[in-house]
Amino acid sequence: MLAKRIIPCLDVRDGQVVKGVQFRNHEIIGDIVPLAKRYAEEGADELVFYDITASSDGRVVDKSWVARVAEVIDIPFCVAGGIKSAEDAARILEFGADKVSINSPALANPQLITDLADKFGVQCIVVGIDSYYDKETGKYQVYQFTGDEERTKATQWETRDWVQEVQKRGAGEIVLNMMNQDGVRNGYDIEQLNMVREVCNVPLIASGGAGAMEHFAEAYQKANVDGALAASVFHKQVINIGELKQYLKQQGIEVRL
């Protein structure tokens, strides 16, 4: 059995790490490189960096910090934000990232997933999915441009269908960002994770809602996710990654110590 992964998520805007609640009202957390280093030293299995303004601004991630991160950490990391072509992805991977993640650009051009998977291998290609539960319709909808409050919009895709579509096109891993839960810290949406897990045959990473150690255990035990991503609880030092791993081990969950 593969060890379950703990993945801190760093939202980057204008070269600094920021954090919002439900994708809004971002506050500055600090500089990228020291935070990345701290998480690697605490025992994170992997890091994810989202340039949250890149796609909505129509620009690619400013890559200078990617090389600086690669110099100070020895764990895999993934970079997302405005990657619209194989050239964009190649540049990020050359700077030292291990994976690239695409979200809004994949919705605009699903062929991009296939192009990247063919060129770099599926193991490098992560698709991020921003999923919102609409209480009125009772459906989970995929949203686009979530890094910009003014441009965020629902797409025609229901979450379950898009999960199946991106796998057909070559996604090697899926990060499910549950927008209703984001930054609220009251637990992952287990029901939604189970719905997605049923149709997801690639590694599935839960994102949005972690507030306590039990929430991580729940996602692994009740929804069989491969990894859990969190931001607020790590940035604000509510949870220490080393202690979290000891706790998970006590719960009988396989983790790398």
Curated annotation (Swiss-Prot):
Reaction(s) catalysed by this chain, per the record, are: 5-[(5-phospho-1-deoxy-D-ribulos-1-ylimino)methylamino]-1-(5-phospho-beta-D-ribosyl)imidazole-4-carboxamide + L-glutamine = D-erythro-1-(imidazol-4-yl)glycerol 3-phosphate + 5-amino-1-(5-phospho-beta-D-ribosyl)imidazole-4-carboxamide + L-glutamate + H(+)
Where would you find the membrane-spanning parts of this chain?
A: none
User: What SUPFAM superfamilies does the annotation carry?
Assistant: Ribulose-phoshate binding barrel
Signal sequence annotation: none
The subcellular location is: Cytoplasm
A GO molecular function held by the record? lyase activity
Query: Which Enzyme Commission number(s) are on file for it?
Result: 4.3.2.10
Where mainly located? cytoplasm
Task: Name the domain of life.
Answer: Bacteria
Which Pfam families does the record match to this protein? His_biosynth
Q: Which GO terms describe its cellular component?
A: cytoplasm
Q: Its Gene Ontology biological processes?
A: L-histidine biosynthetic process
- UniProt KW Lyase keyword: yes
Q: Where is the active site?
A: 11, 130
Q: Which UniProt keywords apply?
A: Amino-acid biosynthesis, Cytoplasm, Histidine biosynthesis, Lyase
Instruction: Please indicate if the UniProt record lists Transferase as a keyword.
Output: no
Q: In which pathway does it act?
A: Amino-acid biosynthesis; L-histidine biosynthesis; L-histidine from 5-phospho-alpha-D-ribose 1-diphosphate: step 5/9
Q: Which HAMAP family match?
A: HisF
Q: Which family does it belong to?
A: Belongs to the HisA/HisF family.
Role this protein plays = IGPS catalyzes the conversion of PRFAR and glutamine to IGP, AICAR and glutamate. The HisF subunit catalyzes the cyclization activity that produces IGP and AICAR from PRFAR using the ammonia provided by the HisH subunit.
| Quaternary data | Heterodimer of HisH and HisF.
Name recorded for this polypeptide: Imidazole glycerol phosphate synthase subunit hisF1
